[in-house]
């Protein structure tokens, strides 16, 4: 698989490419299946439909990897938190965590066993996927998942989380540790179900100041990665902490690919990290609105990463109103322009 070869810095005939949120609302085919499912969470829990939308970007765009369709918050959901998605508001937990008692009510022993709909979707997708295409499993980072569990929803300033971080860091560490243990087992089950690679999304990494990022986020991601790499050395692990371009000098550990977001200069990440890791990224997602902007962005990134191990991706998720034609143009342009 070209994607897996690139993760391990092996030579590839061209630069492999996939897109975060590639199974998503910009595809009319996705919207049709989502309508049939009824709502977002029902789609996540219907393994046949989740598999169907995971495969759509392979069939429509010919990307080099599929990522399983799911959500990072199914983990706290199955630990016993009451999750709902409100239109225009995103995810909401009606019972956010603020005390040790709240945390102790959560089931960390059986949560990974209740996520069979994810594993079944992975199995079905891997069966249907051609052998040269990789299947990516994923989870959120403990820190990013914890922000939703503590805030009760998305947040602009993470005030409740940060209040806990400074007033009661022991409790925050207990929450993060409990999540970490569940996520290890969750990812292991994903690998057993057919995932060829794992990505850990740390979407809210940039909410933390320098030292706190390493203490409350990165160290927990590394604990998960160390667990996976010790048991499954042939499964590449991708870490994607978003918005931490100022923290790159301390990025080190046992993983394979570092995801670069669009706000980080790629040459900076290349100079600091490409001797150790394959880099993934980092096209500004809004460039996909315009074909000239796509061409300019692709040329710049390919030039920056010339002769370095690289997986092409957006610097965050594809937006819902991107024309499908532009997405197709983007994928084809990368694959053809980078052909050796």
UniProtKB/Swiss-Prot annotation:
- Job of this protein: Catalyzes the decarboxylation of four acetate groups of uroporphyrinogen-III to yield coproporphyrinogen-III.
Q: Which domain of life is it from?
A: Bacteria
Supply the HAMAP family for this chain. Answer: URO_D
Q: Does the keyword Transmembrane apply?
A: no
List the Pfam families: URO-D
In the record, biological process GO terms are: protoporphyrinogen IX biosynthetic process from glutamate
Look up the EC number in the record and give it.
4.1.1.37
Catalysed reaction per UniProt?
uroporphyrinogen III + 4 H(+) = coproporphyrinogen III + 4 CO2
Query: Which residues are listed under the site Transition state stabilizer?
Result: 71
Q: Where in the cell is it found?
A: Cytoplasm
Q: Which family does it belong to?
A: Belongs to the uroporphyrinogen decarboxylase family.
For this protein, the record's InterPro entries field holds: UROD/MetE-like_sf (IPR038071), Uroporphyrinogen_deCO2ase_HemE (IPR006361), Uroporphyrinogen_deCOase (IPR000257)
Tell me the subunit arrangement: Homodimer.
PROSITE patterns in alphabetical order? UROD_1, UROD_2
The name of this protein is Uroporphyrinogen decarboxylase
Its gene is hemE
Q: What Gene Ontology cellular component terms go with this record? A: cytosol
Q: Where does substrate bind?
A: 21-25, 71, 148, 203, 316
Keyword Nucleotide-binding applies: no
- Quote the NCBIfam families the UniProt record gives: hemE
